[in-house]
Amino acid sequence: MLSVELHAHSSLSYDGRDAVEKLLARAADAGLDALAVTDHDEIAASLRAVELAPEYGLLGIPGMEVTSAAGHVLALGVDEQIPDGLPFGTTLDRIHEQDGVVVVPHPFQESRSGVMANISRAELAQADAIEVYNSRLLTGRANRQARTFAREHGVPQTAGSDAHISEMVGRAVTLVETDERSVPSILGAIRDGRTHIEGRRTPWHISFRQAAGGAKRKFRERLASLLE
């Protein structure tokens, strides 16, 4: 059984704070086996984390959080950046073309780009897995909805800290039923549904601070682009 963090952001995300080195150090301190850095519409930091992970005694899983036209989609096991803004189904196809795994994070949280505001339940069931525990959700309702949906439709389940600062890495993890510490083995277990969920909610004041900081950074970046 391996303990895996499948949802974490570095400073390459507009709302992330820390370099991948800090995320890796925290993952090692938390006793994790593997970490996927999943920045918003960027893959460079994730690929860097894959290179550095062995220095921390970890396995790095390449990935990113893609902003599809419907909302957020985690692409795990991909080596090339998936374009943002594509339709939900096309985004899934692009991920699968790289033999990647599609995990839909916080699907019922509309305020945080959850896809269920824009797709059908049949479309959501096409995902390889659904994130049924996201530690940044302020209430448990959206997580419960995700878990109920996954159970009713037989979709594999994952958890993710959705960490935007290093201290929150490992807050919610996916326990994967495999003894082989490799990306293909972990992703294969997720596809097969050989997973268990462990998680604790991110303190609300940290979630609010992260959200506010991300909004300010995004505003500054947009303003800078307008002034160029």
Where are each of the predicted segments found?
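Charged catalytic cores and adjacent phosphate/nucleic-acid-binding surfaces used
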Residues: 1-6, 10-14, 18-20, 25, ...
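Divalent metal-dependent hydrolysis catalytic cores, especially in the metallo-beta-lactamase
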Residues: 23-41, 100-103
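Short beta-strand/turn micro-motifs composed of small residues
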Residues: 38, 106, 161
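Loop/turn elements at helix/coil->beta-strand transitions in domains of secreted/extracellular proteins
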Residues: 57-58, 99-101
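Aromatic-lined carbohydrate-recognition surfaces of secreted/lumenal glycan-active proteins
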Residues: 103-111
